[in-house]
Amino acid sequence: MRRDIFQAIADPTRRAIITLIALQAMTPNAIADNFHTTRQSVSKHLRILTECQLVKQEQQGREIYYSLEIEKMKEIDKWLNQFRKIWETRFNQLDNVLSTMKKQKK
């Protein structure tokens, strides 16, 4: 089943996993060591992140390493950027209003 990226990142544990593996690939056990939860729970989160292609797995010897799929993160950033631009415009407008009010007080 293909999952929605935004449903995947809605969970705080999965966001924390993304933050962890953004710096370096990690095994499920190494990831689980950073949480107060079971290895099975971390595996479930990794499966969801893998299904929505935010995370990729690579076999190295007997270990599986999970790493961040940068292109999928770029898709999220691109989608969020449209809202970033809207809010930047609104904050700039607010700055202008506040500057005008400040000048009128003097």
Regions found by a protein language model. Give the residues of each.
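Short, Lys/Arg-rich nucleic-acid/phosphate-binding segment
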Residues: 59-65
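C-terminal regulatory/oligomerization modules of transcriptional regulators
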Residues: 1, 8, 19-34, 39, ...
